[in-house]
From Swiss-Prot:
HAMAP family: UPF0229. It comes from the Bacteria. Residues 65-108 are annotated as: Disordered. InterPro entries: UPF0229 (IPR006698). This is UPF0229 protein Pmen_4018. Belongs to the UPF0229 family.
Length: 423
């Protein structure tokens, strides 16, 4: 007898494969809908699914059929209106539509196909082909991670991991092996008893002897236990090394008085998108939140996104604090260090060259990637031009982009973290 063991991850959801095939087929429609959803959603509404509409004309299956036009001779049974040789006028073309015109008794069409993608699928499409650039495998002593995988069957294990089917199968095989000869003798004894009762009903001594033998064999068979400790089988799980990269992301946000509420909202959206991306795609990553005005301080996630504290503008305070935290907690030989900075570009004039020097001399030589987004519809100011010098010196690990409105967040985010081809 053969056994089929279904170890697919989606074994209980048989339609998952078909759904994945469908999502691959209409990937362009879904990606476009996801991009539109990201640009219109609120700050706290980034992790929900989305309703996708696909035009009916795009879901038609290719079929073989007769082409339009041409001449055909067709006999319609039961037709009393026309006779042989008469020409039937072509029907007027009609089509369904969704316009605002008057109702009609002709024409037909097809509504758009609408379906829902889950939260997981939404985030998959949102962060598709994105990654942290220049991520290097850096080893930490004693910090290896492991994942639990199935490694067959064991005779010992935790009762919660008992494999019932394999246990019963083993017990059945053991009972057959231990009682096989007794069962064969029992069948022979029963056949002999039936013969004696039929052919020699008066031979009481032999009949009693056979009956005693049957009882003895039956007792021997029943003494074989239904289940023995030898039969117990357990699912064996082992820990498999799972190499991982240690990374830290510094999030630096300007909350000075020059940042309007709309500008702060765009900055928060950018960082929430970054935060979701990091938490979803990387198991071993730490996030350091830094808010700054005239002074900078490290805060938790709640205060970073929702604190109302404000003040003047000295951008270098955030960079100095970042450098101090790097030196204190994140050795460069063990950590991949990343940073993302958001500001409206306003800064105390004498401070912008200081920011450039800190980046070039104290931060950029030790980080994998640094991104700067300037949120302003106006012309760039001194800070942007100082950062351009940083970009020239570190063209592979420094990037800067401008955000004008919330609609620019997702395209700029994808451009900053687009997966790069490695030659």
């Amino acid at each position: 007898m053969s056994y089929v063991i279904d170890r697919r991850l989606n074994g209980k959801n048989k339609s998952t494969v078909n759904r994945q095939r469908f999502l691959r087929r209409y990937r362009e429609h879904i990606k476009k809908a996801v991009e539109e959803a990201v640009s219109r959603r609120s700050i706290t509404d980034m992790e929900h699914g989305e309703q996708i509409s696909i035009p009916g004309r795009d879901i038609d299956e290719p079929v073989l059929h007769h082409g339009r036009g041409g001449k055909q001779t067709i006999v319609h049974p039961g037709n009393k209106e026309f006779t042989a040789g008469e020409r039937i006028p072509r029907p007027q073309g009609g089509g369904g539509g969704r316009g605002s015109g008057k109702a009609s008794n002709s024409g037909e069409g097809m509504d758009e196909f609408v379906f829902q993608i889950t939260q997981e699928e939404f985030l998959d499409f949102m962060f598709e082909d994105l990654e942290l650039p220049n991520l290097v495998k850096r080893h930490l002593t004693g910090a290896d991670t492991f994942k639990t995988v199935r490694a067959g069957i064991s005779n010992e294990g935790n009762p919660s991991r008992i494999n019932i089917i394999r246990t019963l199968r083993s017990a059945h095989a053991r009972r057959i092996a231990l009682s096989g000869s007794s069962r064969a003798k029992l069948r022979e004894a029963k056949a002999e008893l039936l013969r004696l009762r039929t052919e020699e009903p008066d031979n009481f001594s032999d009949i009693q002897e056979i009956e005693a033998e049957i009882e003895r064999l039956s007792a021997r068979i029943h003494r074989v236990p239904f289940l023995d400790t030898f039969d117990l089988k357990y699912n064996l799980l082992t820990k498999q090394p799972n190499p991982s990269s240690k990374a830290v992301m510094f999030c630096l946000m300007d909350v000075s008085g020059s940042m309007t509420q709309a500008t702060k909202d765009i900055a928060k959206r950018f960082f929430i998108l970054l935060y979701l991306f990091l938490k979803r795609n990387y198991d071993k990553i730490e996030v350091v939140f830094i808010r700054h005005h005239t002074s900078a301080k490290e805060v938790d996630e709640e205060e970073f996104f929702y604190s109302r504290e404000t003040g003047g503008t000295i951008v270098s305070s955030a960079l100095k604090l970042m450098q101090e935290i790097m030196a204190e907690r994140y050795p460069i030989n063990e950590w991949n260090i990343y940073a993302a900075q958001a500001s409206d570009g306003d800064n105390w004039n004498d401070d912008s060259p200081v920011c450039r020097d800190i980046l070039i001399n104290q931060i950029m030589p030790f980080v994998q990637y640094f991104t700067y987004v300037e949120i302003t519809p106006r012309e760039h100011q001194a800070l942007w031009f100082e950062y351009e010098q940083v970009a020239e010196a570190f063209d592979e690990s420094f990037a800067q982009q401008q955000l004008v409105s919330a609609a620019d967040i997702y395209p700029v985010f994808r451009e900053l973290f687009q997966r790069r081809l490695v030659s």
